Regions:
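Conserved PLP-enzyme active-site core in the AAT-like
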Residues: 1-116
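Non-catalytic terminal extensions of PLP-dependent enzymes
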Residues: 100-105, 110-244
Length: 244
């Protein structure tokens, strides 16, 4: 699964790509960082795989009415990266590096960088990802995510209890990153509070009352939330993306 790794094939000083690491097959989501339309992706085949056999297997399950719009967007994006990929992702890295430095200069935020690489718990770092710790501002990452979306018209990728992730890709410009930095500065000025008010991030060991397989195949019914006390939820509840 190389959903977030399209740029590894074109960028310089990037983490090793799945195919370079020896994968037989890699699913690459071009729409995430390669510029194609949402839902479009490639399946890359390594030298040990019979491409015609892979195609035959895929034809057993996929629709015979594929979206030509998605396929054309894949081909256009593929050509664009083949001709200009290194230049494009060099610019993406420059933009992300600029934003990371500006955010860290604001105070209270921490935009993660390659300084975390230690050869052990952190093996490598994707410099195109702009991950920002928000706890010292006294705000959870999901709170900053919501504020950016609702009041600054900036949609980021993800927010959790302590972090915010901005996905910088082929479509971003310098002014987009400047807007993000300015918005974070304004959020710090207007909303900063004592981080002691944040919810404590304690791990609560869950009580397993049904395994995933049992829950999936069990009979289910839809109920209003107020009537579900004491019942077992048959769906997954998780931070998303990535939903793993």
């Amino acid at each position: 699964d190389e959903a977030h790794g399209t740029h590894f094939y074109f960028g310089e000083n990037m983490p090793v790509s799945a195919m370079a690491a020896g994968a037989d097959l890699a699913s690459v989501s071009m729409h995430k960082s390669g510029g194609s339309l949402t839902q479009s992706s490639f399946l890359l085949c390594g030298p040990s795989m019979n491409a015609e056999h892979v195609r035959q297997i895929i034809n057993l399950t996929q629709t015979t009415s594929g979206s030509y719009l998605l396929m054309v967007s894949l081909d256009i994006s593929r050509k664009n990266l083949a001709l200009h990929g290194k230049e494009i992702f060099r610019k993406v890295v420059d933009l992300t590096t600029y934003a990371r430095e500006e955010i860290n200069a604001l105070g209270d935020y921490y935009a993660y960088g390659s300084e975390l690489i230690n050869g052990d718990t952190v093996y490598d770092f994707d410099t195109t990802k702009l991950a920002v710790n928000t706890l010292d501002v006294g705000l959870a990452g999901i709170e900053v995510y919501d504020i950016l979306r609702d009041f600054y018209d900036i949609q980021t990728e993800f927010g959790d209890l302590g972090n915010l992730l901005a996905y910088v890709s082929v479509g971003d410009r310098e002014r987009d990153l400047e807007r993000l930095v300015a918005a974070l500065a304004d959020i710090r000025r207007r909303y900063k509070r004592d981080k002691a008010t944040l919810m404590r991030q304690e791990y609560i060991s869950p009580q397993v009352v049904a395994g995933p397989q049992e829950a999936f195949y069990a009979p289910k019914k839809s109920l209003p939330l107020r009537e579900t006390e004491g019942m077992v939820c048959s769906e997954f509840v998780m931070c998303y993306p990535p939903g793993i």
